């Protein structure tokens, strides 16, 4: 399954989220109808069947998995690989999975406030504008470690672009830039960020039930 490149608010409406997928889009929406031509109501009654409970449980797990995938902008195969990697690590599989995704370079650039969304941060990385420990890294899935130093290349145009975004006022129709989490340090004047430690669970950039995702992949990954 390829990476999603379609309408982003459509995904937010699909999940009926009161808070948007912050990594995917900054835009707000008050439209609570399902996306599509006929705008199906969410509370429409459906006939109960013997398998309705089983289907409902599967649907809940699937939705949590899709929320995670869309927020971080990863493919299905990438997510499966992260789940397998998390299982090999000691501790909670769900929490380790979230930490692996949070420590991706594109997400770190986003959480430092240098880009409005994770896709925008991924562009900065892929185009070679991000430096890790004084070495240019153009792989968005690069796994950052504690004490890594993240900076921007000496390209004046890019540095000006990032500085203007950081210092700009947020329009009313967009969400404000999120607070920089406790495990990161960022100097706005030098555009220099440092990773102090692995991200704590309470600073994960998405409200999600990771246990449901682990259960979803219990027989697949």
Curated annotation (Swiss-Prot):
Species annotation: Pleurastrum terricola (Filamentous green alga)
Pfam families: Ribosomal_S4 (PF00163), S4 (PF01479)
Localization annotation: Plastid, Chloroplast
One example of a Gene Ontology biological process annotation: translation
Compositional bias (Basic residues): 37-53
Domain S4 RNA-binding: 103-161
Keyword Metal-binding: no
Official protein name in the record: Small ribosomal subunit protein uS4c
Gene3D superfamilies: Ribosomal Protein S4 Delta 41, Chain A, domain 1, RNA-binding S4 domain
Quaternary assembly: Part of the 30S ribosomal subunit. Contacts protein S5. The interaction surface between S4 and S5 is involved in control of translational fidelity.
Protein family (similarity comment): Belongs to the universal ribosomal protein uS4 family.
Stored InterPro entries: Ribosomal_uS4, Ribosomal_uS4_bac-type, Ribosomal_uS4_CS, Ribosomal_uS4_N, S4_RNA-bd, S4_RNA-bd_sf
Task performed by this protein: One of the primary rRNA binding proteins, it binds directly to 16S rRNA where it nucleates assembly of the body of the 30S subunit. With S5 and S12 plays an important role in translational accuracy.
Keywords on record: Chloroplast, Plastid, Ribonucleoprotein, Ribosomal protein, RNA-binding, rRNA-binding
SMART domains in the cross-refs: Ribosomal_S4 (SM01390), S4 (SM00363)
Gene Ontology CC entries for this record: chloroplast; small ribosomal subunit
One annotated GO molecular function: rRNA binding
Residue segments, region Disordered: 26-53
